[in-house]
């Protein structure tokens, strides 16, 4: 794979993706005017350029996380027929929007004579050329909105990681005394839980605080390697179990429309890599090959999504839980699967957290004297970790938080914004009416999913508080 660690390369992309957050508003306006006339050096250097297979691996890694393990429940919420078909449709729509984003960014780099523009810059420069005078005047707000959505999405991922770690750790600890080498199917029995899930979240908190204080790229690359190894090993064992018979029959092909709204949020959340498309292309040794990597990689990702979601739902039926790891049988083999995947998620937390921290921390530190810089740096990082933890404590429902984050921020970044950018970018260049209608319809579809999915997730959160309290005393053996 080369001498440069893969994570270090992607970390550079992610930091460049968000731009210079510490610049003042006055300075940013000056930099925009000057950058339009002079080329800007992009994040890719020839020595650091990544090969086809490396970009392919990064694309897979950026789209396989905790949301991936929630797809069986998502298929349950949509139905055995509607779920896989909808996953395919949403996947195709998301990839199309990624392609739109790439085309807009490529066009703007040529127009502005720059080597690279990130998502926020693409939004800002697109608005500067749109037909609306008001939007042209306030184009910088497009950059701020996208940056805010990216931060919310990344911190939302971190909150989901807290819940995932707590749920799996609770199950491992409370089932340890009757776990053996013989795998037994999991059946539901009502028993008194030893400790609440929230206790495990608070137990994990200090370890994650210590983890995020590590900022050395070489150490982070080691974390990335460990996360990749444990995640791939766990997924191999999970798929090995899912293909075994028996499977449930007579499962509903079409589910309730209200639960389908939860499916939409989960499906969009699972496509976590939309923010990585532009920086990954900028890091590629042969950028002209990136569309091939994108379509090949995302086709494989969608195939994995459909397989896991469908096989998982067929395997566990109505007992399907928020994460498929919670449905695995009781034996040391599959307890080790939970442990390995949890280790991978634990280290991935630091990688996901690194992105919003690189935006927020420098901005805050620049407001204090040098004597207080280190203290403020550590304090802000600690506060952000605590924020993600307390968010998980307040809403300890993994499936609903995944759906909420997906509906609120992921849908905007993946579906709503890119088509609007295409209209704004190419409006002055005689864009066809058919393309405008197509883009408007895609954005409206994404907006409907965002509003209705958010409403349904919030409704379920308020209505099922008592359900969670009852479920916290339920252990599976």
Swiss-Prot record:
Principal localization? membrane
Q: Where are the transmembrane segments?
A: 55-75, 78-98, 145-165, 203-223, 226-246, 260-280, 292-312, 345-365, 375-395, 400-420, 433-453
Top-level taxon: Eukaryota
The UniProt entry lists membrane topology as: Multi-pass membrane protein
Q: So which stretches are on the Cytoplasmic side?
A: 1-54, 99-144, 224-225, 281-291, 366-374, 421-432
Positions of the UniProt region annotated as Disordered: 19-43
Entries under Pfam families matching the protein: Aa_trans
Q: Which UniProt keywords apply?
A: Membrane, Transmembrane, Transmembrane helix
Q: What does UniProt give as GO cellular component?
A: membrane
According to UniProt, the tissues expressing it are described as: Specifically expressed in testis.
User: Between which residues do disulfide bridges form?
Assistant: none
Compositionally skewed regions (Low complexity) per UniProt: 19-40
Subcellular compartments: Membrane
Segments on the Extracellular face? 76-77, 166-202, 247-259, 313-344, 396-399, 454-477
**Family (UniProt):** Belongs to the amino acid/polyamine transporter 2 family.
Name of the protein in question: Proton-coupled amino acid transporter 3
* Gene responsible for this protein: Slc36a3
């Amino acid at each position: 794979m080369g001498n440069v660690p893969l994570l270090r390369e992607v970390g550079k992309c992610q930091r460049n993706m968000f731009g210079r957050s510490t610049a003042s508003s006055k300075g940013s306006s000056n930099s925009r005017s000057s950058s339009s006339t002079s080329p800007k050096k992009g994040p890719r250097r020839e020595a650091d350029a990544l090969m086809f297979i490396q970009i392919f691996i990064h694309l897979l890694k950026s789209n396989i996380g905790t949301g991936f393990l929630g797809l069986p429940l998502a298929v349950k919420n949509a139905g055995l027929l509607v779920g896989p078909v909808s996953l395919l449709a949403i996947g195709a729509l998301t990839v199309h929007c990624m392609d739109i984003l790439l085309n807009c960014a490529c066009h703007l780099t040529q127009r502005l004579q720059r080597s690279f523009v990130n998502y926020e810059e693409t939004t800002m420069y697109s608005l500067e050329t749109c037909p609306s005078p008001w939007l042209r005047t306030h184009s910088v707000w497009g950059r701020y909105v996208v940056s805010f959505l990216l931060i919310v999405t990344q911190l939302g991922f971190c909150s989901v990681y807290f819940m995932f770690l707590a749920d799996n750790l609770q199950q491992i600890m409370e089932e340890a005394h009757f776990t053996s080498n013989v795998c037994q199917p999991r059946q539901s029995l009502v028993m008194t839980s030893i400790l609440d899930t929230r206790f495990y979240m608070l137990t994990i908190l200090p370890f994650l605080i210590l983890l995020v204080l590590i900022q050395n790229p070489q150490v982070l690359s080691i974390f990335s390697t460990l996360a990749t190894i444990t995640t791939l090993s766990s997924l191999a064992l999970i798929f090995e179990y899912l293909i075994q018979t028996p499977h449930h029959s007579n499962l509903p092909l079409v589910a309730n429309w209200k639960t389908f709204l939860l499916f939409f949020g989960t499906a969009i959340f699972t496509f976590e890599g939309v923010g990585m498309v532009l920086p990954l292309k900028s890091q590629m040794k042969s950028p002209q090959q990136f569309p091939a990597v994108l379509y090949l990689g995302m086709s494989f990702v969608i195939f994995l999504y459909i397989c896991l979601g469908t096989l998982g739902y067929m395997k566990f039926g109505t007992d399907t839980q928020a994460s498929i790891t919670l449905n695995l049988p009781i034996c040391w083999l599959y307890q080790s699967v939970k442990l390995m995947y949890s280790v991978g998620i634990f280290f991935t937390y630091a990688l996901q957290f690194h992105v919003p921290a690189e935006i927020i921390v420098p901005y805050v530190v620049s407001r204090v004297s040098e004597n207080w810089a280190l203290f403020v740096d550590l304090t802000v990082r600690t506060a952000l970790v605590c924020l993600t933890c307390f968010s998980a404590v307040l809403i300890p429902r993994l499936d609903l938080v995944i759906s909420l984050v997906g509906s609120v921020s992921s849908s905007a970044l993946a579906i709503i914004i890119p088509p609007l950018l295409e209209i704004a970018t190419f409006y002055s260049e005689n864009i066809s009416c058919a393309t405008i209608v197509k883009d408007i319809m895609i954005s409206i579809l994404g907006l409907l999913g965002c509003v209705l999915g958010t409403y349904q997730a919030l409704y379920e959160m308020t209505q099922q508080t008592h359900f969670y309290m009852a479920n916290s005393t339920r252990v599976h053996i």
